[in-house]
Swiss-Prot record:
InterPro entries with a match to the protein in the record: MPN (IPR037518), RadC_JAB (IPR025657), RuvA_2-like (IPR010994), UPF0758 (IPR001405), UPF0758_CS (IPR020891), UPF0758_N (IPR046778)
Biological classification of the source: Bacteria, Pseudomonadati, Pseudomonadota, Gammaproteobacteria, Pseudomonadales
Name of the molecule in the record: UPF0758 protein Pfl01_5539
Family that this chain belongs to: Belongs to the UPF0758 family.
Record organism: Pseudomonas fluorescens (strain Pf0-1)
Hydrolase recorded as keyword: yes
NCBIfam families linked to this entry: PRK00024.1 (NF000642), radc (TIGR00608)
PANTHER family: DNA REPAIR PROTEIN RADC (PTHR30471), UPF0758 PROTEIN YEES-RELATED (PTHR30471:SF3)
Motif (JAMM motif): 173-186
Length: 224
């Protein structure tokens, strides 16, 4: 049965407009993005099929163009639309983070870091550079690959802190495994960067680790 033949209260688009996007399932949200189904499948049926094929919404969003485009009902045009939507979301949250005080609204920072880092297939280490009022100046991804105590160079973090005229920084990196628990290398790296930045009077406020759930704050856990 076509979605057009469903009762209005059950159609994903109408439900989104009436109840908000948070009320929809992953399949319903994806169905709105797809807009149409394929012969024998409604957009919701197709969305469920795709989520089953990829394993989760996150894995679908992280898929490269080749893996994405070869699936039923998808293609280069849909891939381009999805990439554009994700980039708009990143830029929206980047602008929000620059307009709000990080320490007074840590959830804005968490939300921003989830969008920026959660879908990266490899580890990425970055910094949120803050001014003296702890307003976000900018975000920079500084290192990519295996993040350990030797891969991240304190001198580069110091250099970028000076270039951005930062008074404080929030460190962050992702764990592609999804487990946000800090490793011993993560803790050692944090200490090294704290010591290096102390020499130029830049304070490290926190180190967030982004996994599948809410980003973990090392400061809140008492590890800084």
């Amino acid at each position: 049965m076509s979605i057009r033949d469903w009762p209005a209260a059950e159609r994903p688009r109408e439900r989104l407009l009436e109840q908000g996007s948070a009320s929809l399932s992953d399949a319903e949200l994806l169905a709105i993005f797809l807009r149409t189904g394929v012969p024998g499948k409604s957009a919701v049926d197709l969305a469920r099929h795709l989520l089953n094929q990829f394993g989760s919404l996150r894995l679908l969003l992280e898929a490269d163009q080749e893996a994405f485009s070869k699936q039923l009902g998808l293609g280069p045009a849909k891939f381009a639309q999805l990439q554009a939507a994700q980039e708009m979301s990143k830029r929206h949250l980047a602008e929000r983070s620059r307009q709000k005080t990080a320490l007074e609204n840590p959830q804005v920072v968490r939300d921003y870091l989830k969008v920026m880092l959660r879908h990266e297939p490899h580890e990425v280490f970055g910094c949120l550079f803050l001014d003296s009022k702890h307003q976000v100046l900018t975000f920079e991804a500084l290192f990519r690959g295996s993040i350990d105590n030797t891969a991240v160079h304190p001198r580069e973090v110091v250099k970028r802190s000076l270039a951005n005229n930062a008074a404080a920084v929030i460190l962050c990196h992702n764990h592609p495994s999804g487990n946000s628990d800090p490793s011993q290398a993560d803790r050692l790296l944090t200490k090294r960067l704290q010591k290096a930045l102390e020499l130029i009077d830049v304070r490290v406020l926190d180190h967030f680790i982004v996994g599948d759930g809410e980003p973990l704050s090392m400061a809140e856990c008492g590890w800084m």
